[in-house]
Structures are given as C-alpha cells and as structure tokens.
Design a protein with these regions (language model features):
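Conserved beta-strand-loop-alpha-helix hinge in the C-terminal portion
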Residues: 115-145
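Hydrophobic anchor residue at the start of the ABC signature
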Residues: 50
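Q-loop/switch helix immediately C-terminal to the Walker
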Residues: 1-7
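Conserved H-loop
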Residues: 91-96
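Conserved signature/switch motifs of ABC ATPase nucleotide-binding domains
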Residues: 35-38, 56
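Conserved ABC ATPase "signature" region
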Residues: 7-10, 14-31, 84
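Catalytic Walker B motif of ABC-type/P-loop ATPase nucleotide-binding domains
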Residues: 61-64
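Helical segment within the ABC ATPase nucleotide-binding domain
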Residues: 75-89
Length: 157
C-alpha cells in the first residue's frame, strides 16, 4: 500500500520495498508490515498515510484534518510524531485543522480563513520554541488572539 506510488513511477521492486520499509520504520510501524488496513488502529492508519505520502518525496505535504477522527490521547501522540518526522524530513507541511490548540502546537505560521467567502483573514506567526508547552502564557496569548479572530465574524472582541 505504501509503495504503490513508487510502482506507478516504475521504481524496481527491491528499491520500492527498501524505501517502503525505511518509511515504515520512520513512522514506527515496521512490525506491522504485513498487516491489512482493517487490522490497524486509527492512529496506525494515519501513520501509514504519512509514510505513503513521504515515500514519494513530495516538496510539500498537504494534510487536511488528518487527526480529526482520533481520540484526544492518540491525537496528541500523532501531533508529536508529526513534529518528529518533520524534523527528520524538513518538508513543508500545509496542515488544515479546526483545532486552535493543534494549530498552535504544530505551526510556525497560522493562516486564519474567514467564513463564506473563504479568504485569508489573518496570518499569525508562532514565535514559540519547540517543544511547546500547551498551557504556557505565550500559548494562551496566541490562543486568545485566534479565538478573538474567529469570533469577530459574529461579535466584536
């Protein structure tokens, strides 16, 4: 499943398997190489999706609500895993989320979109060093600004 894109590119079988195993190791699933999708948890499926994307060596990785269906604990683990993988791969990641906390934890820059018509409402740089403390005063200030931006379409902050 992970190496299907490489097969379409005509990459030889041995090289495909080698690269697939490399990315399975990166996402911590090397022990599950022979498992079928229905045998994997939600978090494992998300890791497979990340490996499948990265094995194709994209310039940027687009992730649209990838952790939205996960429970809170698995979501937090996957956020940390994504940051670890990002540190290794140094790829641009465009991450769409409705979770303010997730955006602050993961992003270097947050782009807030308005409601209909969708347009850029605000661009907020996140100058907080990693690892980030999700409850720090710096995070709280940014969270307040974002929530105010989001509410301002309805109310004045």
């Amino acid at each position: 499943n992970i190496v299907f894109g490489l097969e379409l590119k005509g990459i030889p079988s041995a090289e495909r398997l080698s690269q697939g195993r490399q990315y399975l190791r990166m996402v911590g699933l090397e022990r599950f190489e022979t498992r079928y999708p229905h045998e994997l948890s939600g978090g494992m499926k998300q890791r497979v999706a990340i490996a499948r994307a990265l094995v194709n060596h994209p310039k940027a990785l687009l992730m649209d609500e990838p952790f939205g269906a996960l429970d809170a604990q698995t979501r937090n683990i996957m956020q940390s895993e994504l940051l670890r993988i990002w540190e290794e791969e140094k790829k641009t990641v465009i991450f769409v989320t409705h979770s303010v906390d997730e955006a602050i934890y993961l992003a270097d820059t947050i782009v807030i979109m308005s409601a209909r018509p969708g347009r850029i409402k605000d661009v907020i740089p996140i100058p907080i060093q990693r690892p980030r403390n999700r409850t720090s005063s710096e995070v709280n200030l940014i969270r307040d600004r974002i929530l105010c931006d989001l509410r301002s379409e309805i109310l004045t902050c």
